Amino acid sequence: MSQQALADKPLLSRGMIAVLCAQFFSAFGDNALLFATLALIKQQLYPDWSQPILQMAFVATYIVLAPFVGQFADSFAKGRVMMVANGLKLAGALVICFGFNPFLGYSLVGVGAAAYSPAKYGILGEITSGEQLVKANGMMEASTIAAILLGSVAGGVLADWHLGVALGVCALVYAIAVVANMFIPKLAAARSGSSWRPRAMTGSFFTACLVLWRDGEARFSLAGTSLFWGAGVTLRFLLVLWVPIALGITDNATPTLLNAMVAIGIVVGAGAAARFVTLKTVKRCLPAGVLIGVAVAIFALQHSMPMAYLLLIIIGILGGFFVVPLNALLQERGKNSVGAGNAIAVQNLGENTAMLLMLGLFSVVVKLGVPVIAVGVGFGVIFALAIALLWGWQWRQQRQKTAE
């Protein structure tokens, strides 16, 4: 479809609505299953440091499959790719439901998620264009975060009530996501005819990595989103251990409610980014990134539920405002160079490598007995410094470009 035809289409087209609905149910299942599975391993008396390992098993699938999923997304109609990926998530949820190893089942969900991600973001560049792409990303993030909000709370609350029901609901939601994918219009493959030999695919993927990392704006986006999502997933597990220490509450529901506050904030921040940031003004998001780290450090010192809620909402608002423009920038740069699916696969490699490293470090410091409040403060300070360095680096690159 031509760029002009895309620009003339309303943002909330039939295809866009179908994509948003499918994404909502898929993300709902992901987040409900995470907290239900955390409750399961807690019930089975696994040690505290094993909780991040669950997410690391999930994340590792993204890294292993990174060379292949971008081409998979670009070689077939992306709506059908999303449907197959949700089917794999359903299979993983059933593995956990029927009492098999939860780490194995959650890894299978990770395989589905790895295949799903390039397709869900890549399809936005095929059904929207230009400045509508930033708005579409804002809507996608809002749909995702609404699902995180409801899914996280549902997973924790249902697990406190009946763990078997919680796991069954997760499987049902994935089944609904599979059905929702059937309503996405079938679009032509973005890049059909590529080689399916593993060696050629791996070479093609790392070529795409080099192309994007040599592009200044794409590199800036990749670094920013990797830091953000690495920190975001670590914060989720920090909350699980922080709540009993700082608030004296030991149920499964409270950490999910606190995670939901971040989700509410990200919805607001994503909306603000769609309203106030364009592809030409992406750098406006950087101060929000620094403030995320400051807010996390302050949050870790709290012992009051109302202040915890307020600070987590603020962290979410800053996060949404920070990450949405960076996603849109990468999709635009990727679509014009290596393909949107490959660009998102490269992004996933960066983000999940950051997650794996941060979760691994978090697991180590917990195992070593470092107080969780100290971990939270240190985590916030390091994140703020990392984004400040990214900001300074980008400013320097811009000055050099202007001088030339």
Swiss-Prot record:
Record membrane topology: Multi-pass membrane protein
- Localization: Cell inner membrane
Cellular component terms (Gene Ontology): plasma membrane
Q: Any idea what job this protein has?
A: Catalyzes the facilitated diffusion of 2-acyl-glycero-3-phosphoethanolamine (2-acyl-GPE) into the cell.
Q: Which gene encodes it?
A: lplT
Which InterPro entries does the entry link to?
LysoPLipid__transptr_LplT, MFS, MFS_trans_sf
Molecular function terms from GO: lysophospholipid:sodium symporter activity
Task: Kindly provide the name given to this protein in its UniProt entry.
Answer: Lysophospholipid transporter LplT
Pfam families cross-referenced by the UniProt entry: MFS_1 (PF07690)
- TM segment ranges: 16-36, 53-73, 91-111, 139-159, 164-184, 195-213, 227-247, 253-273, 285-305, 310-330, 350-370, 372-392
Protein's UniProt keywords contain Plastid: no
Q: Which UniProt keywords apply?
A: Cell inner membrane, Cell membrane, Lipid transport, Membrane, Transmembrane, Transmembrane helix, Transport
Q: What protein family is recorded?
A: Belongs to the major facilitator superfamily. LplT (TC 2.A.1.42) family.
